[in-house]
Amino acid sequence: MSAYCQVTGRKPSFGKSVSHSHRRTNRRWNPNIQRRTFYLPSEGRSITLNVSTKGLKTIDRDGIESVVAKIRARGEKI
């Protein structure tokens, strides 16, 4: 899935667009996904993650090592 955050698990949300005449059509709101490369000092290599902007704040707060450990605990391969 392209619009999926590997850190927070955010996915597109769905809803309706409502026009001036109140006609409703389906639409989706995509999360703000950024493809970022992070260096893991413990492994001596870089990894590339698809992360939302909220996921970037999580990495800044908790550190890349602990975030990668949580992703691997969920069973995702990095």
From Swiss-Prot:
One Gene Ontology term, aspect cellular component: ribosome
Pfam short name (any one): Ribosomal_L28
Keyword Transmembrane helix: no
Keyword annotations of the record: Ribonucleoprotein, Ribosomal protein
Recorded family membership: Belongs to the bacterial ribosomal protein bL28 family.
HAMAP family: Ribosomal_bL28
Protein name: Large ribosomal subunit protein bL28
Organism: Corynebacterium jeikeium (strain K411)
Gene: rpmB
